UniProtKB/Swiss-Prot annotation:
ATP binds at residues 132, 196. Pfam families: HK (PF02110). Keywords: ATP-binding, Kinase, Magnesium, Metal-binding, Nucleotide-binding, Thiamine biosynthesis, Transferase. Substrate binds at residues 57, 223. One of its GO terms (biological process) is thiamine diphosphate biosynthetic process. Pathway: Cofactor biosynthesis; thiamine diphosphate biosynthesis; 4-methyl-5-(2-phosphoethyl)-thiazole from 5-(2-hydroxyethyl)-4-methylthiazole: step 1/1. It catalyses: 5-(2-hydroxyethyl)-4-methylthiazole + ATP = 4-methyl-5-(2-phosphooxyethyl)-thiazole + ADP + H(+). Its EC number is 2.7.1.50. Disulfide bonds: none annotated. This is Hydroxyethylthiazole kinase. Catalyzes the phosphorylation of the hydroxyl group of 4-methyl-5-beta-hydroxyethylthiazole (THZ). Belongs to the Thz kinase family. InterPro entries: Hyethyz_kinase, Ribokinase-like.
């Protein structure tokens, strides 16, 4: 925290923007299209609806490109891959970039497998507007894109599937580099990276925030991170990248805390999470703990 009045004013302005984003999503029901993995597609769509948005799910490149023309934003998740995705996803990313469309990337299991690596490497020059992942995925993507000097890159300890083996603190520099890279090529002139963990981190490359809270039960259901990526895309349809990433992460922190109290285990937690996403107020989200760091 800072006692600097200018810092406090800036944080107050940010809170107001977060509140407005939550309000706008529920008032406008924006469409965020998802090309997401097979395991979690149902939860992603339901979470987008519960947050107040509209969902569209597709795997056909021509469908995705056509729907992007009417969608407010888009979401690509590389969690489960088929052979044709190796050509389809780079083409989709190129078209989104050429057409000035915003999108969110979840680089699930970055660093594992030649196909996934080739796809993620292809996004470097036509990148998303927001990247959301765990610490290991963020570190791996930063390394894939060659954004760090060789002597300053901190590689992930080992590939870990969809689970992080690195702490959020280890991904701070990688997240900042990625965010600055996204901003340089973004159709809206800005980008953001959200790193999920015990204490989430969100950065636009210039300002960095830590978000305490949330529930450890999020690690006991499949698709929590994937659905957060989808909801981040929902917010990106109405807000600039930093605000969208913060609003989605904070919404999930508050909703997961409520869901944990109301559930008896993973099954009821998932149901309670959807209910909480629906019921958490804009004021509750905006009033969450937000710690600005260097």
């Amino acid at each position: 925290m800072s006692d600097d009045p200018s810092t406090n004013d800036a944080l107050g302005t940010l809170r107001a923007a977060i509140k407005q984003a939550v309000t706008d999503v529920r008032g406008q029901t924006p469409l965020a299209q998802s090309f997401t993995n097979f395991v979690t597609i149902n939860l992603v769509a339901n979470a987008q609806l519960a947050a107040g948005g509209t969902a569209a799910m597709s795997y056909l490149p021509d469908d995705v490109i056509a729907t992007a023309e009417i969608a407010g934003s888009n979401y690509i998740n590389v969690g489960t891959l088929l052979p044709f995705f190796k050509n389809a996803l780079p083409e989709i990313a190129r078209k989104l970039h050429e057409n000035g469309k915003t999108w969110v990337l979840d680089p699930v299991a970055a660093g594992i497998g030649e196909t996934r690596t080739a796809i993620l490497e292809s996004f470097r020059d036509v990148p998303p507007t927001i990247v959301r992942g765990n610490a290991s995925e963020i570190i791996a993507l930063d390394a894939m894109w060659g954004l760090a000097d060789a002597d300053s890159t901190t590689p992930a300890t080992r590939p870990a599937g969809v689970e992080a083996v690195d702490e959020v603190d280890a991904a701070v520099d990688a997240a900042k580099r990625l965010a600055r890279h996204l901003a340089k090529r973004s159709p809206v002139g800005a980008g953001a990276v959200a790193v999920s963990g015990a204490v989430d981190l969100v950065t636009d490359g210039e300002r960095t925030f830590r978000l305490p809270g949330g529930s450890a039960m999020m690690t006991k259901i499949t698709g929590a991170g994937c659905s957060l990526g989808g909801v981040t895309a929902t917010y990106l349809a109405v807000a600039e990248p930093l605000v969208a990433a913060l609003a989605a992460s904070l919404l999930y922190d508050r909703a997961s805390e409520i869901a944990e109290v109301k559930s008896d285990g993973p099954g009821s937690f998932q149901v309670a999470l959807l209910d909480a996403l629906w019921n958490v107020t804009a004021d509750q989200v905006a009033a969450s703990d937000i710690i600005e760091t260097n």
